[in-house]
Amino acid sequence: MTPRYIFRDPPLSYRIFRGLAYAVGVFIILTIIAALLLRFVPPITSGVMIERYIESQTGDLPFSKNRSKKQNYEPHYHWVPLSKIAPIMGVAVVTSEDQEFADHFGFDWEAIDKAIEYNQTHRHTRGASTISQQTAKNLFLWDGRSWIRKGLEAYFTVLIETCWSKERILEVYLNIIEFGDGIYGVESAAQHFFNKPAAQLSNDEAALLAAVLPNPHVYRADNPSAYVIERQTWILNNMHRIGGTEYIKKL
């Protein structure tokens, strides 16, 4: 007599685990493909641009409090290659945001340790995000401080550090970073604030734009506060520390 075999469905926990593993695998494959594609192709939008559009439809934009709900939100975003951005602009943002940019693999652990120590004893928190982290966050993610978002930011940071050159990371950063209400990238910022292309930015103008980057929701390039002017002066006085425009040529 032929024995009968009864095949039972695997336990629910196993099916859930298998489904999650499959989803994670698909996510990793798709994000690697996206990163490899964006190594050569300019992004048509970014996570932050999409987030700001959604906020504009709910009246929750972090900029003007005088806007009405479902405002006419018109993002200004114009991609230009790094060769059409004044080299001093790259020097200014590296001086301001991430002086170890050329040497780290996405994370400045010394700056992170200092920020943790500072935040334990001060009311206002200090960040330690590198240019690579900011690029990953602005391109692929959204604003927020949850552990899930921070974990995704770390993943995408490692991904672009692996797939892109430092030059490409800086190029994407300068093109998608937020400089003000609906103003994305240094070309749009140069045209909006100085009525000139990014290729013609002066040292003072580049330093001013870099000075608002810690928080473009609060600091303005068209009406700089005393803090922004002080920050601009500090950037101008410290750009030589990383080697000036020669720094960009070595990336």
How should these model regions be labeled?
Residues 2-251:
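Juxtamembrane regions of bacterial inner-membrane/periplasmic proteins
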